[in-house]
Each structure stands twice: as structure tokens, then as C-alpha cells.
Swiss-Prot record:
Cofactor: pyridoxal 5'-phosphate
Keywords: Amino-acid biosynthesis, Cysteine biosynthesis, Pyridoxal phosphate, Transferase
EC number in record: 2.5.1.113
The protein's name: O-phosphoserine sulfhydrylase
Gene designation per UniProt: cysM
Length: 323
């Protein structure tokens, strides 16, 4: 076991787990080379999500740049996980945090933010986190002393994955052929993707995004208006559109088959990864596909995504799943 002086040091170096049951072909054989899926369990970070990486990096970079001083107020638009990560770090460092988030977020995310001492300003549910971003920008303009870290355009977001997630994947899976993650702020795909492209010949970087007009929590479709400033389409090999029901179905399949209890966005990522795997299998190509489990499902139990039939879940989730 590793010893740390602070919780802020205990992020990253998350496990990479083989999905033997879900992989299209785990072993090499007469039928062709293996097509394996590997899940990077980012729910093992201190607050339970991949967002601990950029949150701590953005705060520390703002401190280094002289933007954050003792007692400062941080403002951030968030659909949940980044806010929770920032709230943890702000609590430990003595900053005040104000989060702007859609009013249709799950009760667990609200309670966690409040428990950490963050103030929540709710934006209209319509438009999801896009509306939260607009609201936060208005607040920042009228409160110039507040520091908006702005995860959608902050290079420290991308850097946290270029310097962390990417090198970890390469160390654990040097034979990696594909990397699949969700499109949200785009920081994970841009940072990890850039690192892997620089170090692995012919690696494929695949984005899972919501089908146009459908919401999947924490993900966004780049064709629906707001495009994060971090987004560079040249990093991507492909974008894979996933419907909300498919995301929920795959989330349940992951826990039933591999025992991994993941958040809803991971279902979308798994759906895309299985599509990539099916293509490799049909082409007779070896594939080692790494996918991101961005968080666990605990913060979404109240949404109804995990109870009853898929039809029940679809009804319960209507109006709740926003990017």
C-alpha cells in the first residue's frame, strides 16, 4: 500500500481491469486474434470520479498563476462530478466554492456538494450544462473577484490527462490499439488521446457521444450548439453516437456480467467500445481496447436508472439525463 500526506495526493494510478466476459474474443485462437476490452476504473479516485484529476490540476495551476489566494471564491459550471471534486479540494485548501448546475441533477450530487460546503446556484433544466455554462459566465462578469476555473476551456483539464491518464494507460497496456471515452468537457479524450497518439503508432481514439437530440448524463453531442474550447476534432479517429436507452442497458450489462457498478455515461462508452470491438472481430484484427469508467453508479440511484425494466428506467430518466 502507498502512504500519502494528503488526500489530494491520492488521485490517479487507477486499476485497469480486463473485461473477459464482455470482450468479443479474449484469447487468441484458430478463429482469429484476440479482441479484448479493458476498463480503467476512475471511480477509484478520492471522490469517486475521473474529475478529481482535472479539478485538482486546475486549482493548483490557478494557485501557481497567482489567480487563487487564501480565502478566494471559485465559481464553476458543472453537472455534478467536477463540482464534487472541486468541493473536496476547495474544502481542504480553504476556498469558497460556488457551483452552477442544472436544476434536474440527482439529489445525491446536490447532497454531496452541500456536505462539502459548496454553494449551489441552479440553472434551468432546459439546455442542461450548456445553460449552466451561460449562467456561470454571467455571474463571473458581474463578480470579477470570483475565479472561474472553467473546465471546458482550461488547458489544465487536458494536461491532467496528458500527464496522468495517458501515461498510466501506456504503462499498464503498452499493446493498446484503441482508447474510448465520453465526450463531455472533452478533456479526457483530448489529453489522453494526444499523449497516446504521440507514443503509440496507429492508435485509434474514439469518442462516445449522445445521439443527436438525446441526453446522456455528463456527455454532449458536438452538433448541438456549445462546443468546448478544449475540443480538437483532429485528435479523434471516430465519434460513436449512443442512445440514452442503450447507455442504461449497457450500464446494467456491465454490472451483471463483470460486476462493475458504473455511472450512466460509462454505459455509453461501453456501447461504443463494443461496437469498435465488433468491427475489429469482423476484420480479423487484434484489438486491445481501453475504455474509461468515469464514475460509479452510487450518485444516480435516485434517478431510477437501475431499477425495474428498461422501459421503467427510460420513463424515470426522462428530463434527468443532461450533458
Amino acid at each position: 500500500m502507498t502512504r500519502y500526506d494528503s488526500l489530494l495526493q491520492a488521485l490517479g494510478n487507477t486499476p485497469l481491469v480486463g473485461l473477459q466476459r464482455l470482450s468479443p474474443r479474449w484469447d487468441d485462437g484458430r478463429d482469429g486474434p484476440h479482441v479484448r476490452l479493458w476498463a480503467k476504473l476512475e471511480d477509484r479516485n478520492p471522490t469517486g470520479s475521473i474529475k478529481d484529476r482535472p479539478a485538482v490540476r486546475m486549482i493548483e495551476q490557478a494557485e501557481a498563476d497567482g489567480l487563487l489566494r487564501p480565502g478566494a471564491t471559485i465559481l464553476e459550471p458543472t453537472s455534478g462530478n467536477t463540482g464534487i471534486s472541486l468541493a473536496m479540494a476547495a474544502r481542504l485548501k480553504g476556498y469558497r466554492l460556488i457551483c452552477v448546475m442544472p436544476e434536474n441533477t440527482s439529489v445525491e450530487r446536490r447532497q454531496l456538494l452541500e456536505l462539502y460546503g459548496a454553494q449551489i446556484i441552479f440553472s434551468a433544466a432546459e439546455g442542461g450544462s450548456n445553460t449552466a455554462v451561460a449562467t456561470a459566465k454571467e455571474l463571473a462578469a458581474t463578480n470579477p473577484s470570483w475565479v472561474m476555473l472553467y473546465q471546458y476551456g482550461n488547458p489544465a483539464n487536458t494536461d491532467s490527462h496528458y500527464c496522468g491518464t495517458g501515461p498510466e494507460l501506456l504503462a499498464d497496456l503498452p499493446e493498446i490499439t484503441h482508447f474510448v471515452a465520453g465526450l463531455g468537457t472533452t478533456g479526457t479524450l483530448m489529453g489522453t488521446g494526444r499523449f497516446l497518439r504521440e507514443h503509440v503508432a496507429n492508435v485509434k481514439i474514439v469518442a462516445a457521444e449522445p445521439r443527436y437530440g438525446e441526453g446522456v448524463y455528463a456527455l454532449r453531442n458536438m452538433d448541438e450548439g456549445f462546443v468546448p474550447e478544449l475540443y480538437d476534432p483532429e485528435i479523434l479517429t471516430a465519434r460513436y453516437s449512443v442512445g440514452a436507452v442503450d447507455a442504461v442497458r449497457r450500464t446494467r450489462e456491465l454490472v451483471h456480467t463483470e460486476g462493475i457498478f458504473a455511472g450512466i455515461s460509462t454505459g455509453a462508452v461501453l456501447h461504443a467500445a463494443l461496437g469498435v470491438g465488433a468491427g475489429a472481430l469482423a476484420a480479423g484484427e487484434r484489438a486491445d481496447i481501453a475504455l474509461v469508467v468515469a464514475d460509479a453508479g452510487w450518485k444516480y440511484l435516485s434517478t431510477g436508472a437501475y431499477a425495474g425494466s428498461l422501459d421503467d428506467a427510460e420513463t424515470a430518466l426522462e428530463g434527468q439525463l443532461w450533458a
